[in-house]
């Protein structure tokens, strides 16, 4: 149970834990919500870059380059890469080999 719902009280020269309301539905719901919030926060921090790109650009796929000359494909690829790497006025320079 959550540390916030536990109360330590002196019992017979010892420190014990008295959790009278641990079966209260509100306490159980709050604990579950707290655990889910913590898990989602950790996942957000771990996958921040992926989440940011997903919400900013959606699930858009690049246009088909069938029948397009290689020089135009390369220019399009650079434009798409620069659009993805732009993060709130922070520009990332990537050299393609």
UniProtKB/Swiss-Prot annotation:
GO terms for cellular component: host cell plasma membrane; membrane; virion membrane. GO terms for molecular function: monoatomic ion channel activity; proton transmembrane transporter activity. It is found in: Virion membrane; Host apical cell membrane. Residues 62-89 are annotated as: Disordered. The M2 protein from most influenza A strains is inhibited by amantadine and rimantadine, resulting in viral uncoating incapacity. Emergence of amantadine-resistant variants is usually rapid. GO terms for biological process: protein complex oligomerization; symbiont genome entry into host cell via pore formation in plasma membrane; symbiont-mediated suppression of host autophagy. Residues 71-80 have a biased composition (Basic and acidic residues). Pfam families: Flu_M2 (PF00599). The chain crosses the membrane at residues 23-43. It is a single-pass type III membrane protein. InterPro entries: Flu_M2 (IPR002089). A lipid is attached at residue 50 (S-palmitoyl cysteine). Belongs to the influenza viruses matrix protein M2 family. Cytoplasmic tail plays an important role in virion assembly and morphogenesis. HAMAP family: INFV_M2. When the channel is activated, one or more imidazole moieties of His-37 probably become bi-protonated. This is Matrix protein 2.
């Amino acid at each position: 149970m959550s540390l916030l719902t536990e109360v330590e009280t002196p019992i017979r020269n010892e420190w014990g834990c008295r959790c009278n309301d641990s079966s209260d539905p509100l306490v159980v719901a709050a604990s579950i919500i707290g655990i889910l919030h913590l898990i989602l926060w950790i996942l957000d921090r771990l996958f921040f870059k992926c989440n940011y790109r997903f919400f900013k650009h959606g699930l858009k796929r690049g246009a088909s380059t069938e029948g397009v000359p290689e020089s135009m494909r390369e220019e399009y690829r650079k434009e798409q890469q620069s659009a993805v790497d732009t993060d709130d006025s922070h520009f990332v320079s990537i050299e393609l080999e």
